[in-house]
Amino acid sequence: MKILMSNDDGVYAPGLLALYEALSTMAEVMVVAPNSEQSGCASALSITTPLYTHQLPSGFIAVNGTPADCIYLALNEIYSDTDFDCVITGINSGANLGQDVLFSGTFGAALTAQLFGIPAIATSLVGGGAKSSEQECERHYQMAASEIVKLLTDTPILDICKNLPYHVLNVNIPDVSNADEINGRKMTVLGHRKIARPVHHVVDPRGRDAYWLSLRKRQDIWADNTDHVSSGTTMTDDQAVAAGYISLSPVRLHHTPAATLDMLSALML
């Protein structure tokens, strides 16, 4: 098996390293990732600036671009002669729940892979070990990585993904250090936050107004998601991780809802 990896936290991120080490026990793994953090850039491509690559002693390839750039470059140039079985991105530092997928570079990289017909899985550690010491944080990522390997080896998820074109599997893993703290896996739908992330206004040393779009949220407030749930037993992704489950959300690239399209067509035409 051949797996291509990337992320949005950068080529030196602990989540990327932990996942690489875990996946390398079961597959040949290649890494092409940004040379610096690219959180929040979604599936943006660099079309006005050139991209440069640098191979690290680890064999990882660093790119001065976005996560989507990395996948685009890997599939069409660097590893264009390689038939990858799948692309796995992450492990992201922090959750990618609900509408996070619209902004996440980790998800955007997986999305780019699917546009080229490669099965893709985006992975995130909810909390990203933020509550832990550096050593404990490393254990959390290692635990999350081992759960991803179990998902690939103990379930037919890769075969399922291969038969679901234009879908990305979005995986969120609770931030714990021991596997026995995880209650299992749940298939979920994306949740929905009721409030936007705050904007912080500051004045820089030259007296100019400056604004920070905060990626570290205040307390999340989640909407009632019952209208998105397909059955009474289906959880949203945020509900699942809050209950100690690994959340698995299939996300379809085809965003046009057929029922809404039919309704509007009947009204407009």
Swiss-Prot record:
Binds 1 divalent metal cation per subunit. A divalent metal cation binds at residues 8-9, 39, 92. It catalyses: a ribonucleoside 5'-phosphate + H2O = a ribonucleoside + phosphate. Disulfide bonds: none annotated. InterPro entries: SurE (IPR030048), SurE-like_Pase/nucleotidase (IPR002828), SurE-like_sf (IPR036523). One of its GO terms (cellular component) is cytoplasm. Pfam families: SurE. It is found in: Cytoplasm. Its main location: cytoplasm. Keywords: Cytoplasm, Hydrolase, Metal-binding, Nucleotide-binding. Its cofactor is a divalent metal cation. Its EC number is 3.1.3.5. Gene3D superfamilies: Survival protein SurE-like phosphatase/nucleotidase. GO terms for molecular function: 3'-nucleotidase activity; 5'-nucleotidase activity; exopolyphosphatase activity; metal ion binding; nucleotide binding. Belongs to the SurE nucleotidase family. NCBIfam families: surE. This is 5'-nucleotidase SurE. It comes from Psychrobacter cryohalolentis (strain ATCC BAA-1226 / DSM 17306 / VKM B-2378 / K5).
